[in-house]
Structures are given as structure tokens and as C-alpha cells.
A protein has these predicted regions:
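Generic enzyme active-site microenvironment
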Residues: 8, 232, 277
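Short alpha-helical patches at coil-to-helix transitions and adjacent helical residues
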Residues: 51, 55, 204-211, 277-281
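C-terminal cap/loop subdomain of S1 sulfatases and analogous C-terminal strand-loop tails that border
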Residues: 19-22, 71, 84, 235-241, ...
Length: 333
């Protein structure tokens, strides 16, 4: 129907994108700092912080590359807040004065749920001091047993000298105090949780700031009132519930996925009906006036966004996790 399409940021599939008029994607998961991209088949490294770079590329495409006489569909896919939660340099001190409340089930004993106890996403035993919590000391005295220490040190070494100077100013005192305190047991577990939460929230703050940049561009260029904006993720995440980080296990914290939609003229407030990510494609096609292919999974929830009642809307969902052993050793369920 005449739409220009673009994919910018995290792709994380084996193949290169097809069916897009323009694409500029991170290689693999992408790196937080000085990430490598593939731009329409050509590899290029860009200096800076991934969240800012992806946003810069997206705004540049809207402003300077697309044909402004045509409608467009743009996917802006960020690496953040994926592991390892490396904050932007300007956010390193953010929330320093905050102590995050512990989830009530942080020390879950998994009574009657033995399979849930046999995984490798425990903050206490699986969150790596160097890879996840940035304890890459220059004396090389902090060592870990998860197999991720080298990768953590490589992430630090990938920073340029200017970036390292700012990074060190923040983390060197934290590393020194950690060595001095020699934490064990619950004290270590709760220290890990606080470090994790601080870095995660800093990374989220950067996402929030950059979403604001996109919205500001749309507003300033008269695009807000004829553009549907979708903010979502590929799953929820554990923020210490059951003592975990990551996702995969089908408790509500992981199963429920963020989804915010702004549809000009659409319903305001919450929509209570259950939707899935397989519904996104049909919804976007429906809005664009394109017939949804018969073999496409999911259904359009555009009527729900307009405030319409759909009497036969789904009342249940099916979940199946089958990738065992794979990463984090979550059992099939």
C-alpha cells in the first residue's frame, strides 16, 4: 500500500533482513559501547552508546532518508535493557541514593516446584561479578566460576580511553569497597541485587530518554496525529522475584510483556483483553489497509485499540518452553 519500511537496531536473527526498504542492524545481540552494525550488507562500527546511536539512526532515517511523500513503518529495536545492563556514561551516578526493596520471594525455596529450582538464572549463584556486575578490577584479583569472567573483561576493554576514564571514576570505588567488605551469604546476594537493580534502572532511564527524543521528533514534524506508536518488548523480566534475573520460566513476571500503544483517535486507558506478540503483525497490516495473509498467526487487535468490544476474543493462552538445556538451563515446561 505504498509504505516505506525500515528496520534499525537489534535484529538478532541468523539471516539478514528481507522485505525492508532500508535496514541498519546490530550484529548479534549488539554491544552497548561502540557497537558494530550491518547497514544494507556493509559492516560498520560506530562510536558511542548503542541506545543513543540507534535513536540517532532512526531519526536520521525519518528526517533525511525516507520519501516524505509516502507513509512509513519504522522498527526501532534497542539492545537495552538486555544483559549486561551497561549504563550510558551520563547515567552512571543515577539513583546512587536509592535502595531498592527486595521482592518478598527473593529467597524462594521452590517448595513443591522442584523443576523451578533447577535453573541457572539465580542472582545468588549465577549472576557473574565481572560480566554482570562490572567488577573487572585492574589488579585481576576478582575471579568467577560461571565462565563469563573473560567476556566481562573484554566488554570493559572495548571501551575507548575517554569512555574508560569516566567508567573507572564510577566503578573503581565500588570495586575497592567490594574487595574490602569481603561479602558472603545473604549480604553478598543482597549486594548483587542492588547492583543489578541500579544498572538496570539506569539502562531503562536511557531508553526512556531516547523514546522521548523520537516522540519529540514526531511532534515537531507534525506526525503525531497520523502515526500509531507501539512501545513493547519480547517478554517480561525477573527483577529479583524468586531470586532470579532473566526470563524464560513462565511465571507472570516473565510471561507478561510490556505493551503501550498510542493510536490517534483510539481508546484511552487500559485494554484488559489478552493479546500476544503474534498479534502485532496482523494489527499493523490491518491499520495499513493490507489484507492479513491466511497463514499468519495471531489476529488484529485494532478493534480493541479503537474501544470496540470483540465478543469472541481469546480467554486463554498457551505457553510452551522447549529450549532445554540451552542458556540458563531452564527445564522444558
Amino acid at each position: 500500500n505504498g509504505y516505506q519500511t525500515a528496520m534499525i537496531g537489534k535484529w538478532h536473527l541468523v539471516s539478514e533482513p528481507t522485505g525492508f526498504n532500508y535496514w541498519d542492524i546490530l550484529i548479534g545481540q549488539g554491544d552497548y559501547y561502540n557497537p558494530k552494525f550491518i547497514k544494507n550488507g556493509e559492516r560498520v562500527q560506530r562510536e558511542g552508546y548503542a541506545t543513543n546511536i540507534v535513536t540517532d539512526l532512526a531519526i536520521n532515517w525519518m528526517d533525511s532518508i525516507r520519501d516524505k511523500s509516502k507513509p512509513f513503518c519504522l522498527f526501532i529495536h534497542h539492545k537495552a535493557p538486555h544483559r549486561t545492563w551497561m549504563p550510558d556514561l551520563c547515567d552512571l551516578d543515577l539513583y546512587d541514593d536509592v535502595t531498592y526493596p527486595m521482592p518478598e520471594n527473593f529467597y524462594d525455596k521452590y517448595e513443591g516446584r522442584i523443576p523451578a529450582s533447577k535453573q541457572e538464572m539465580s542472582i545468588i549463584k549465577d549472576m557473574d561479578l565481572v560480566y554482570d556486575l562490572k567488577m573487572a578490577d585492574k589488579e585481576n584479583e576478582i575471579h568467577t566460576t560461571t565462565g563469563l569472567e573473560e567476556a566481562g573483561r573484554n566488554m570493559y576493554n572495548a571501551l575507548n580511553p575517554e569512555q574508560k576514564a569516566v567508567w573507572d571514576k564510577h566503578y573503581d570505588p565500588i570495586i575497592a569497597k567490594f574487595k574490602q567488605d569481603k561479602l558472603t551469604g545473604k549480604a553478598l546476594a543482597e549486594w548483587k541485587y542492588q547492583q543489578y537493580m541500579h544498572d538496570y534502572m539506569r539502562v531503562i532511564h536511557s531508553i526512556d530518554r531516547n523514546v522521548g527524543r523520537v516522540l519529540k521528533y514526531l511532534e515537531e514534524n507534525g506526525l503525531m496525529e497520523n502515526t500509531m506508536i507501539v512501545y513493547t518488548s519480547d517478554q517480561g523480566f525477573y527483577m529479583g522475584e524468586h531470586g532470579w534475573f532473566d526470563k524464560r520460566f513462565m511465571y507472570e513476571e516473565s510471561f507478561r510483556t510490556p505493551l503501550l500503544v498510542r493510536l490517534p483517535g483510539g481508546k484511552k486507558g487500559d485494554v484488559d483483553e489478552m493479546v500476544q506478540n503474534i498479534d502485532y503483525g496482523p494489527t499493523i497490516l490491518d491499520l495499513a489497509g493490507v489484507e492479513v495473509p491466511a497463514d499468519m498467526h495471531g489476529v488484529s487487535f485494532l478493534p480493541l485499540l479503537k474501544g470496540e468490544k470483540v465478543p469472541d476474543w481469546r480467554k486463554s493462552l498457551y505457553y510452551h518452553f522447549y529450549e532445554y538445556p540451552a542458556e540458563h538451563a531452564v527445564r522444558r515446561h
